[in-house]
Swiss-Prot record:
Gene: prlG
Membrane topology annotation: Multi-pass membrane protein
Subcellular location: Cell membrane
Residue ranges crossing the lipid bilayer per the database entry: 37-57, 71-91, 101-121, 125-145, 163-183, 191-211, 266-286, 305-325, 345-365, 372-392, 409-429
Protein name: MFS transporter prlG
Organism: Fungal sp. (strain NRRL 50135)
Region (Disordered) location: 1-27
Annotated GO MF terms: transmembrane transporter activity
PROSITE patterns: MFS
Primary location: membrane
Listed Acidic residues bias regions: 13-22
Protein family: Belongs to the major facilitator superfamily.
Cited Pfam families: MFS_1 (PF07690)
Length: 473
């Protein structure tokens, strides 16, 4: 290509009007950015609340619908999480073609409609189908929320935003059973869905009014279309436009990308497996709470859900630590070089031993029936460690793979995490029946310790591996 052709091509490429263009989402005022982060965080909160808020009422539904199979009874709760396995691949890829906003709005509408369906269900099949579709729709903010944060914030500004984004997936399962227990006792299991519906409806209406598109390629494409119309120059195209691929080919490529990243990138695969194991452990831990706190410590059924708050306290502490330290670590001078994404893993390296320590603490104190506050303190350590593993890993994926592939990287992470969250708890009863609380939790702790070197390995070799295994295309 000649220099003249190159200049002509540059003149026809539509871009932002300089680094300070107010239309660029990264240049929006802090109020607008925070509004979007809070709304996306609210999406994840109510979608994760719904995952387990119904659990205390599951036995009432089983009795009402005459369910006799233990597998089907378990599915009434876990099929929602299975929706998280199937939804992200399609939703993340569509967000990278059509933008984030339309995906949020469509999925919110679907979620609301099928939550009403769950509340009004009259038989098992109807309930399971509606709840699965709810799970698929609820996976949208989990899959593309990190992409929205990457659209809005430069890498060195993402720590606080990701801390807020991480509230939902981790605090939802903690608060859900507490609220669900009281709602089921006083209002019935159907009201767990009506309550989520009210919350989802309010947040969705606010999103319709306040949210705007944030994805750069979509915004530049719209800008180019307006300029073509106003100038009559039909050669104008967005800087991000790919003339070699049709929309169908772009969608196919974006749909394949999460799978490609999971299978071909050791970074995405190993970090996703590690996160999935940590996420699955927290759900598996929940299966022990009724036996430990109701049978061993004599908690009444209506207050046994308060035992979940130990995890919540640990997570709240970790949110503060993450928000304060994550971006500071990225700002530290490192030999005069530009901060690399691997610096996000420092918090993860420090925190890796905490979850195993928490499981040792919880398991053996519960086995020997030490005062009930002691195992709850152990779960606080688990909550602290789990958040400081999951959030640095997600933020690292966002920073390492950029705005255009962040949603795909997080979709791959969400799929594995949700799969482990749905399946691993099923192993809980047989594990603890065979080994007891002490050695059963110790086995999980030893597996957690085996994963501890993973973040250090990627801290040291991640940059080299990203070059060796490129998956952004």
């Amino acid at each position: 290509m000649s220099s003249t052709d190159a200049e002509a091509k540059n003149e026809e490429a539509v871009d932002w009007e300089g680094p300070d263009d107010p239309e660029n989402p990264r240049n929006w005022n802090q109020g607008a950015k925070m509004t979007h982060v809070l709304l996306v965080s609210s999406f994840t909160l109510y979608s994760n609340l719904a995952a387990v808020m119904f659990a205390p009422g599951a036995q009432d539904l089983v009795a009402e619908f005459g369910i006799t199979s233990t597998i089907v009874a378990s599915l009434t709760v876990s099929i929602y999480i299975l929706g998280y396995v199937f939804g992200p691949f399609l939703l993340a890829s569509m967000s990278e073609i059509y933008g984030r906003l339309i995906i949020y709005h469509i999925c919110n509408a679907v979620y609301i409609a099928f939550t009403i369906g769950c509340a009004l269900s009259t038989d098992t099949a109807m309930f399971l189908v509606f709840r699965f579709i709810c799970g698929c729709a609820a996976s949208a903010p989990m899959a593309i929320g990190g992409g929205t944060i990457a659209d809005l914030h430069k890498p060195e500004e993402r720590g606080k935003a990701m801390a807020l984004f991480g509230l939902g997936p981790l605090l939802g399962p903690v608060i859900g059973p507490v609220v669900g227990g009281f709602v089921t006792q006083f209002l019935g299991w159907r009201w767990t869905f009506w309550l989520v519906l009210i919350l989802a409806g309010v947040v969705s209406l606010l999103a319709l009014v306040l949210m705007r598109e944030t994805f750069e390629p979509v915004l530049l494409t719209r800008k180019a279309a307006e300029l073509r119309k106003s100038t009559g120059n039909y050669r104008l195209q967005a800087r991000t436009y790919n003339k070699d691929l049709t929309p169908a080919q772009l969608l196919a490529r974006a749909t394949i990308r999460p799978t490609k990243m999971l299978l071909m990138s050791p970074i995405v695969f190993l970090l996703s497996v590690y996160c999935a194991f940590m996420f699955g452990l927290t759900y598996l831990l929940f299966t022990t709470f009724p036996a430990v706190f109701e049978e061993t410590y004599g908690f009444a059924a209506d207050v046994s859900g308060l035992a979940y708050l130990g995890l919540g306290v640990g997570m709240i502490i970790s949110i503060g630590l993450f928000a304060v330290l994550s971006d500071k670590l990225l700002h530290q001078p490192h030999g005069g070089t530009i901060a690399r994404p691997e610096l996000r893993l420092i918090l993860m390296i420090w925190s890796s031993p905490l979850v195993p320590i928490g499981f040792f603490w919880y398991g053996w104190s519960a086995k020997y029936e030490v005062h009930w506050i002691v195992p709850i303190l152990g779960t606080s350590v688990i909550g602290l460690g789990a958040f400081l593993i999951l959030m640095p890993a997600q933020l690292y994926l966002v920073d390492a793979f950029g705005t255009e592939a962040a949603a795909s990287a997080l979709a791959a992470n969400t799929v594995l995490r949700s799969l482990f969250g749905a399946v691993l708890p099923l192993a809980g009863p047989s594990l603890y029946d065979s080994l007891g609380l002490g050695w059963g939790n110790s086995l999980l702790a030893f597996i957690g310790l085996a994963f501890a070197p993973v973040p250090f390995f990627f801290y040291k070799y991640g940059e080299r591996l990203r070059v060796r295994f490129p998956v952004n295309s």
